[in-house]
Every structure is written in structure tokens, then in C-alpha cells.
Amino acid sequence: MGVWLKNGMSFNKDGELMRTHIKIEHGTIAAILYEQPLEANEEDVIDVGGRLIVPGLIDLHVHLREPGGEAKETIETGTLAAAKGGFTTVAAMPNTNPAPDRKEQMEWLQARIRETARVNVLPYAAITIGQKGEELTDFAALKEAGAFAFTDDGVGVQSAGMMFEAMKQAAALDMAIVAHCEDDTLTNGGAVHDGEFARRYGLRGIPSVCEAVHIARDVLLAEAAGCHYHVCHISTKESVRVVRDAKRAGIRVTAEVTPHHLLLCDEDIPGLDANYKMNPPLRSREDRDALIEGLLDGTIDFIATDHAPHTAAEKAKGIEAAPFGIVGLETAFPLLYTHFVKTGVFTLKQLVDWLTIKPAQCFGLKAGRLAVGAPADIAVIDLETEEAIDPETFASKGKNTPFAGWVCQGWPVMTFVGGTLVWEKGRA
């Protein structure tokens, strides 16, 4: 029989926002009607009341912490947070304990995902054993076990020779290398950006060059290896310039940016609050402006949250001792919609694309589009209601956000994965 989502608004193939009815059947989108009346039995209809219907959002950079970090997050709680944020596909980073660095561990992780995940989870495999940068993992075995791509996110692969070999192996398997870009000899042991905030409080700063020089090295290695190379959480104007030049040279490089690096700079940190501590750190206003420009001109391909939950006790240690990272799955769309679409910096279509079809295209995913035959991974979003961000209402175990109290519009109200309603606002 199927179910109709009635009276929504969505973008057609020409990018026009139109009144829409969508039929879900057998886990896929069976029909789409634009600007037409709907004749269907009442029991087979969900009236979404004029709200926005978009492809389920895609986040290719999240930390679900399981195994080993279950006090911070689990696959179940993290994917419930994803569903609450309108995300139907997330890619899980491998900095867990143990890391998915061998076939058996990847198989365990896949089984755990099947048992507990609320949304689609794409597991990354580690580039090196234990993410220690000393010995490459067995790429072929990990791909066979279901690895999505390879990364040592959380640390940069310091050896150029090891990264080059990793890229050659990944290219032979038609897999991507996804990189946290940071030259450890240049990080200075810092906790924040090497800028005015660091100087004001006498803190050691992380210079911009430690990221940009790593990207510059890697894009040349990727060119030589013929590998798809993806830059995680780009944060500096120099990095944007390197990626832009690499793309112009025809190198197969893609890049992501986080909501927090688009929204904040180090000038916005209110004292020594560890909820503003992440890696890469909040950079200068010039850097933030370059990130926005890079996203708009296509240098940066899409947005990813780098959702990184920690316990309250960990974040209470202070800005120097606390771990890096903030949560982002439940706040990404409302923050970006309110502060960029409502202000005219981005169009609604651009924002939706950067969170759906753009990451899907970069990594060859079937998700990210509303089309007949596509997976029925769908989010319904209320663009009108204003609500303040309240960490105590988060589904994530992590409450570590710098955005508490920010008033936003653009809140997801329903999320479907494979045609199944996995989260609805107001329902337990």
C-alpha cells in the first residue's frame, strides 16, 4: 500500500521549491507529485503541514565512541541524535578502543551497527594499526569487511612515505583516504588557535600553518598516487587556497567544513570555556570568512559536523586539559539555516545540497536525493518555529556545545530511514 507524505515543500529537479506529495513504499520513494492534488485513503497519509521535505541529511564525520568510549556516546545514542537532527546517514570515525584496524574488528562493528543503529552508519577503517602511524592496516581485508574509507582521524599521518603507500593502496581498491591534517612538529602543544585569544590568556596556540602544510604535502602525494583524497574539517584561509589550487590542477581532492568553523572564530570564545575547544580550533575572523567563500565557490564540497561527544567531567577540566571536540548532530541544520539562510548568505537550496547530495556525490553514495527509486531516507523540517538550543534535551550523551541558548529556526520534526519513521518530535 505505502504511505504518502502530504502537503510538504521540496525542491524539484530544477531547484524550484514546490508543494509536494511523496509516496513511500517498500523502503523507497515510489512517487512524487508536484503542485497536484492528492487522492489517497486518509489512513495512508501523513500530512506534514507545509513543512520542508528534504533528502535525509548526510554527515560524513561523526564520532560514535563505541567501542571503548561508551561513557561519552554509543552507536545507539549517537544515531538517535543523528535522527533527531534530520541525519539518515553518518560515517563513524575509527578513533575508538580498539580501532577498526583489522577485519575481525570491522566485522564486530558492522554487527553492532545492525543491532543498535537508528540510521545508516558507514564505518571508517583506520589507515594505520591503532592509529599510531607505524604500520598500515590490511586495506583489502577491511574493504571486504565493509569499510567505507580509510582515515586516522584525530591524528595526522606524519610520515609522507606511509601516507603515499596508503594512497597507492587505496587507489588500487577505488577507496578514499580521509585526512585529519596536522603536522605534529608545528602544533606547539596548543589548545586554541595561535591568535589574539591565546595571547590574551597566555595559552599555547596551534598555528594555521600546521594544517595547511600537511594538506599541501598530501595533495601532491594524492596526485602522484591517483587517489581520492578528502580533507577533514578545513579551518584556515591557507588551507582553502591549497585545496583551491589543487582542484584547479585537476587533483582529485575534496574537502569538508564544520558548522562551528563557519559560525565562530576565536574572538567569540567567552573566557576559558572548554566547550569552545575543538581540533582544529576556532580560527581568526579572516579564516572564517575564507571558509564561507570557499564553500560558496565550490572549493569546499560539503558540510560535516565532526560530532565529538565528551562527558561533563572531562570538559570541566578547563580549556587546556579538557579533550578537544563538541557535539553537532542535533544543532547543525537549525544553526546554519538561522544564521546563513535567514540572513541571505546561503540559499536554502545550497544548504540542503551541502548536507545531502554533495557529500553523496563526493563518495558515490545512493542517498542524498528525492527521486523515484531512491532510498526513502527523508527528513521533514519546520522552518518557522523558534526554539532555544538546550543541551539537556539532547539525545546524545554529550552535552558539550558552545551554542547553548542560541535561538534557532529550522528544526527537524520527522526522520525516515528506508521508509521507516525512526524519530518524530514529541514522541518518545
Swiss-Prot record:
Stored PROSITE patterns: DIHYDROOROTASE_1, DIHYDROOROTASE_2
SUPFAM superfamilies membership: Composite domain of metallo-dependent hydrolases (SSF51338), Metallo-dependent hydrolases (SSF51556)
GO MF assignments: allantoinase activity; dihydroorotase activity; zinc ion binding
Binding site for Zn(2+) 1: 61, 63, 153, 306
Cofactor stoichiometry and binding remark: Binds 2 Zn(2+) ions per subunit.
GO biological process, one term: purine nucleobase catabolic process
Any one Pfam family match given in the protein's UniProt record, by short name: DHOase
CDD domains (alphabetical): DHOase_IIa
Catalytic center residues: 306
Chain positions recorded as substrate binding sites: 63-65, 95, 279, 310, 324-325
Cofactor(s) this protein requires: Zn(2+)
Domain of life: Bacteria
Leader sequence residues: none
UniProt cross-references to PANTHER family, sorted A to Z: ALLANTOINASE
Family: Belongs to the metallo-dependent hydrolases superfamily. DHOase family. Class I DHOase subfamily.
Entry function: Catalyzes the reversible cyclization of carbamoyl aspartate to dihydroorotate.
Record protein name field: Dihydroorotase
Record organism: Geobacillus kaustophilus (strain HTA426)
Species lineage: Bacteria, Bacillati, Bacillota, Bacilli, Bacillales
